[in-house]
Amino acid sequence: YKVLSIIEKAFPYKQMADRQSEMLLAQKYTQEKYDRLTRKYIMDYLQEMGFKSSVAGTRYLQEVLFLLVSGEKKMDETNISELYAAVGEMCNNSDTNIEKAIRVAIEGTWRTSKLSVLQKYYPYIYDEDRGKPTNRDFIYNISYKLRSE
């Protein structure tokens, strides 16, 4: 016991290092939990609009929105192709495949969901001739809406 006491007095940085590593683990756990909850909130919002969670484009859209909502990417500093590339890297896919999958998910939702539901969750103006918002407009408007809630 005395030997341990002498060692602890001689090496107080060991105890401090242990406390710091415990704090870092707690912060990491808290951040992971926050990220999980944020992703769930985004997916719930998309599903309420009519997006299907089983569609790959919806999951990619969730990741793109997460990057913007969590602050990992800034809306005013990031162009849309950088977001596709970041998600493509995370999901082992090309940015063009990410873009196309998101486009298909948006088109499918706009085709199958009720207009009243879409207007409730996406109250922004879009080109009526096209019948849906562009990927860029949708992503930036929804991320702004989610961040403000």
Positions of predicted regions on the chain:
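Receiver (REC) domain switch/output surface
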Residues: 2-15, 20
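Short alpha-helix boundary/capping motifs
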Residues: 10, 115-116, 133-134
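C-terminal output/effector regions of signal-responsive regulators
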Residues: 26-121, 125-129
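Terminal-proximal interaction/regulatory segments of ATP-powered molecular machines
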Residues: 121, 134-136, 140-143
